[in-house]
Amino acid sequence: MRMIVGLSGASGIVYGIRLLAALRELDVESDLIMTDLAAKMVEIETDYRVSDVCALATRVHDCFDFTSPLASGGFRNTGMVVIPCSMKTIAGIACGFADNLLLRAADCTLKERRHLVLVPRETPLNTIHLQNMLALAGAGATILPAAPGFYHRPAEITDLVDHIVGKVLDIFDIEHHLYHQIGRAHV
């Protein structure tokens, strides 16, 4: 299994960091694309260094390297997650405006009919945001808002983050124990 992980410049960068860590723990290869603003969010929202985040990925790709294999629809992978996904990124993908590698990889993921999961954290949403997400859902993307559930009785922020990351892994049928799934015994 090989997954593309895009980190865009939305608040909630901890979701992307946790996904990279979970993929590493689960022996899933990850190809990371991080925008400049995402790197800034790492500094603003966490105690991580950007190099620490990059070290969680199997491979790191420059966001403006259009010679990367990720810029081709022929690049074999399981799918792509953009987590967190800014409204700018959603708009770019929805309009087919691929001016960086993250947007181009998302475009390739859609056109090749692979799983594309977008995790927006923005709130509130305006009509333009909703229309862009509706267009992407119609094109085959999964919109998974960073809106954690509470049925698993979270005790810490990490429980809330793990719930969303677990939902992403569920879409790709990746077994995990990040949250208690209703109907399954807690392991």
Task: Give the residues covered by each predicted segment.
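A cross-family phosphate/adenosyl-ligand binding-site feature
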Residues: 1-117, 123-184
